[in-house]
C-alpha cells in the first residue's frame, strides 16, 4: 500500500537517480501480486483535515518530481493498481501492464476523491469522458481496456513483464540521452501551451539539439551506417 513511508522512499530514490547522471531511466514495479493496491485505509482514517492535505500534497510533490525529472520512469504494473497505485503509475512516462493487471480509482466508494493527482492526470491521459466514467463508477478496468483507452503502452503475459520492461528501457537508453530528456520535457511543457506556442518551443529545442554533439554523432552514424555511440 502507498503509505507516507513508501512515498518517502520513492522521494529518496528520485534524489538518488537525479544525483547520478549515469542513470537515464528508472523501472518501478512490485515483487508482489499487486503493483500498489491503494493507500493504507486504517492510517488514513486517523487523519484530520490538515494531515489529509499534507498527505495529498506529499503525493503531488513526489509524483510531480517524477514528471519533471529528466529521468524516464517506466511503470511495470504486475497486478492491482488501484487508487494511489494508479496515480503512481500515471506519473510514470510509460506504463507496461501484465495481462492480469486491473486499474481503478475507487476513492468515491470511500466518500473521497483521488488525492495524488488522479482527477487531473487521468483526464489528461484518456480524455475527460472516459476519466469521469472510470472515476464515477469506481469500476476496475482490465489491462486490455487500459491499452485500448491509452492508459497503457503495452500488455504482456505476467512472466514476461520485467523482461519486456527492461527491453523497453534498453531501447530508451540507446537513444541520445539529451534528446530523450528533451523529448520528455517538450511534450510535458508543450501540453500546457497553445499550439502556436508549443510549436515555437519545439522549433527552439530542435534547433538547439541540432547543433549539439549528440546530433553530430547520430547524423554521422546514420550516414556511415553504424550504431551511434552516445
List where the protein language model places each region.
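Conserved CoA-thioester-binding segment of acyl-CoA-metabolizing enzymes
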Residues: 1-29, 46, 50, 57, ...
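C-terminal long alpha-helix characteristic of the crotonase
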Residues: 16, 96-101, 143, 152-200, ...
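Short, conserved active-site loops that position catalytic residues or coordinate cofactors/metal ions
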Residues: 29-30, 35-41
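Glycine-rich phosphate-binding loop at the start of an alpha helix
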Residues: 38, 53-56, 60, 83, ...
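CoA-thioester-processing core
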Residues: 62, 66-68, 76, 82-136, ...
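Acidic, divalent-metal-coordinating active-site segment for phosphoryl/phosphodiester hydrolysis
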Residues: 138-145
